[in-house]
């Protein structure tokens, strides 16, 4: 009686992880192949790449405080909860990361507030 594919699959499914690892190594040696995953070519369409790179978390980076540092310090304190000295140091030590890992909506709202106060902000 011949061994079928189903018999082979049933045998393999009953192996332990260690036994399966040894079996894979023997396949690699016997047939001169590698069990490394195959690299898939990237998508050609720009829209598909943009959708794949859509970020969900952003860092709010203060690039420049502008001329109205006092207003920017007030907004930084309100957004971050920092004390006066810490907020002043963050504003004067640009570029500085004000918040990390925030949602897109929160990041855009903070950027708008800071820009209205006279600062230059980047979302990364």
Swiss-Prot record:
This chain belongs to the protein called Large ribosomal subunit protein bL12
Q: State the function annotated in the UniProt record.
A: Forms part of the ribosomal stalk which helps the ribosome interact with GTP-bound translation factors. Is thus essential for accurate translation.
What HAMAP family does this protein map onto?
Answer: Ribosomal_bL12 (MF_00368)
Q: What are its GO biological-process terms?
A: translation
Per its UniProt entry, which superkingdom is the organism in? Bacteria
Question: According to its UniProt record, which protein family does this protein belong to?
Answer: Belongs to the bacterial ribosomal protein bL12 family.
Q: Give the GO cellular component terms, alphabetically.
A: cytosolic large ribosomal subunit
* S-S pairs: none
InterPro entries linked: Ribosomal_bL12, Ribosomal_bL12_C, Ribosomal_bL12_C/ClpS-like, Ribosomal_bL12_oligo, Ribosomal_bL12_oligo_N_sf
What Pfam families does the record tag this protein with? Ribosomal_L12, Ribosomal_L12_N
Which gene is annotated as encoding this protein in its UniProt record? rplL
Recorded GO molecular functions are: mRNA binding; structural constituent of ribosome
Assembly:
Homodimer. Part of the ribosomal stalk of the 50S ribosomal subunit. Forms a multimeric L10(L12)X complex, where L10 forms an elongated spine to which 2 to 4 L12 dimers bind in a sequential fashion. Binds GTP-bound translation factors.
């Amino acid at each position: 009686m011949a061994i079928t594919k189903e018999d082979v699959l049933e045998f393999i499914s009953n192996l332990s992880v260690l036994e399966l690892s040894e079996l894979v190594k023997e396949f690699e040696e016997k047939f001169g192949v590698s069990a490394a995953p195959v690299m898939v070519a990237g998508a050609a369409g720009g829209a598909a790449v943009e959708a794949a790179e859509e970020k969900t978390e952003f860092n709010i980076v203060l690039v420049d405080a502008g001329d109205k540092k006092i207003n920017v310090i007030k907004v930084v304190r309100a957004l971050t909860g920092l004390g006066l000295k810490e907020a002043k140091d963050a504003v004067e030590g640009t570029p500085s990361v004000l918040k990390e890992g925030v949602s897109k909506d929160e990041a855009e709202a903070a950027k708008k507030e800071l820009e209205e106060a006279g600062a230059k902000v980047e979302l990364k």
